[in-house]
């Protein structure tokens, strides 16, 4: 009797450990895991702080939405473990803030290299067409302000 109870507890513990260990792998491989609130595409949510596995932009849904064939590992509001933030690349369309590489079209703030088209602020090198502010070298055509050397045609201010 005692052995049976111990075996069940061990099985439950092992199952939980496997489920928790597989979540970061799915986040890395699939790029979308376990949203913990309803998100509409382009609504401008962020993935910083203590939010658990939220995805930004381009993904709408609510509750526990899992991807990559994994199901039944989350319950309740969809939070799995504390302070587990997503670090997988994705391609949202607009209004996101994150710390992972992506190729957005507009209105993003991040700290990794990318090739956006408009309206971005970042601290890494990029090749941009318009309206950017950054602190690293780039080749830009118009309307930029930065604090590093660059080759620009018009409307730039620099301090080096």
Swiss-Prot record:
Membrane topology: Lipid-anchor
Sequence repeat spans: 86-97, 98-109, 110-121, 122-133, 134-145, 146-157
Compositional bias per record (Polar residues), positions renumbered to this chain: 93-160
Localisation: Cell membrane
Region spans: Disordered: 32-160
Region (6 X 12 AA tandem repeats): 86-157
NCBIfam families, sorted: Mplas_variab_LP (NF033817), VlpC_Nterm (NF045730)
UniProt name for this protein: Variant surface antigen C
Lipid moiety-binding residues (S-diacylglycerol cysteine): 30
Predominant subcellular localization, coarse grouping: membrane
Extent of Low complexity compositional bias: 38-54, 62-87
């Amino acid at each position: 009797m005692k052995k049976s109870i111990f075996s069940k507890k061990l099985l439950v513990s092992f199952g939980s450990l496997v489920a928790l260990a597989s979540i970061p792998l799915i986040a890395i491989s699939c790029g979308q895991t376990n949203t913990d609130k309803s998100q509409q595409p382009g609504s401008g949510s962020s993935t910083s702080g203590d939010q658990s596995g939220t995805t930004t932009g381009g993904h709408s849904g609510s509750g526990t939405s899992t991807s990559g064939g994994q199901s039944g590992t989350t319950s309740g509001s969809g939070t799995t473990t504390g302070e587990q933030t997503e670090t997988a690349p994705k391609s949202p369309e607009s209004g996101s803030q994150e710390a992972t590489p992506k190729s957005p079209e507009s209105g993003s703030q991040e700290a990794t290299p990318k090739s956006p088209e408009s309206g971005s602020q970042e601290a890494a090198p990029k090749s941009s067409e318009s309206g950017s502010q950054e602190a690293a070298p780039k080749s830009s055509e118009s309307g930029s302000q930065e604090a590093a050397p660059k080759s620009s045609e018009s409307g730039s201010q620099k301090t080096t």
